A protein has these predicted regions:
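Flexible assembly/topogenesis modules
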Residues: 1-172
Length: 172
């Protein structure tokens, strides 16, 4: 799906089957890989809203504002300013030019397991069969062109990987 400049749309991801409780989850929307070139920037669409379903708890984060989502990301290690993360800022005009909107980095959500509403007897790394799904509202912050949208979810687990004598073993 291509999203026009400054347009917003809601997307729903396909449910992801998980067998272990993750440490954190990254969610972002960006230009589709198939349309990236050497001339396109590594930026993201602005995330306006999120409603996440995990461990039979639906609607998580659905009442949060853009500022609330940014605060979660900042708490979880994001070092972007609010303007950079939310994707837009204004230039200062002068007597010859009017102020203009400038697209910035855009939003990547990092949700720590502690941010999720999960049962108190469940912790990161536990073997629990579950599904993760979400509906996300995004906005194309590119000021000039439509962008084909790609949703990405990165689920992070704690673990240990050992590389020795050319072979690898892992413990999750």
């Amino acid at each position: 799906v291509s999203l026009a400049s400054n347009a917003s749309q809601t997307f729903t991801n396909n449910a992801i089957q998980l067998s272990t409780v993750p440490r954190c989850i990254y969610i972002w929307a960006s230009r589709a890989n198939s349309s990236k070139t050497i001339e396109t920037s590594d930026t993201f669409l602005k995330i306006n809203s999120l409603s996440l379903n995990y461990l039979n708890v639906s609607g998580q984060f659905s009442s949060m504002s853009l500022q609330d989502l940014y605060q979660i990301c900042a708490k979880n290690g994001c070092n972007l300013s609010y303007s950079e993360w939310s994707g837009k800022c204004m230039t200062i005009g002068d007597s010859h030019t009017a102020p203009a909107v400038v697209g910035m980095v855009g939003s990547v959500l990092k949700l720590d397991i502690a941010d999720l509403h999960i049962p108190s007897n469940v912790a990161s790394g536990m073997n629990v069969n579950s599904q993760l799904s979400y509906t996300i509202g995004v906005e194309n912050i590119d000021q000039t062109q439509a962008i084909p949208v790609q949703l990405t979810t990165c689920v992070v687990y704690d673990g240990l990987m050992t590389i020795e004598s050319g072979s690898m073993s892992s413990m999750i």
